[in-house]
């Protein structure tokens, strides 16, 4: 388990350094719904282990993007929504498009995030609840990767959250 955590950490650091250095990564035409479904499929076992219901809904939304980065966005948002959820809670991933932007929204019934922490959760290694870190695992880089991947694609992130009320994070990506 510790070896796998280190491999994940190294991979996360490499991805962030590529984005920091402005490395040009190859874009392709992809369907955000298909990528989100793939991330959800990969998260299903973790959701079941935590007794969290995970669902994906929406419509196909094509865009020009780096598949691995878009996957990381969906996976990391879904992973956090599961990690910081309550027993018997739910996570819903929804994809939509307005013709100009493809939108991914991950909503959960979890512990929520206080207003004073919301501006910091996308910082590297920042954790709202340090006591929860050991049991939930992770590298502390997932949401930083989300932020950088969204910026790389010229997108925006918005959040609606309150302690005890859950969290909804939306990512809007230009279709180009």
Regions found by a protein language model. Give the residues of each.
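Acidic ATP/Mg2+-coordinating residue in the GHKL
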Residues: 108
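Conserved micro-motifs of the catalytic ATP-binding
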Residues: 21-26, 58, 62-68
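Short alpha-helical segment of the dimerization/phosphotransfer core of two-component systems
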Residues: 1-6
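Short conserved segment of the HATPase_c
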Residues: 113-127, 147
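Conserved glycine-rich
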Residues: 154-155
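Short conserved segments within the C-terminal catalytic ATPase subdomain
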Residues: 46-56
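A conserved beta-strand-to-alpha-helix junction within the catalytic ATP-binding
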Residues: 26-44
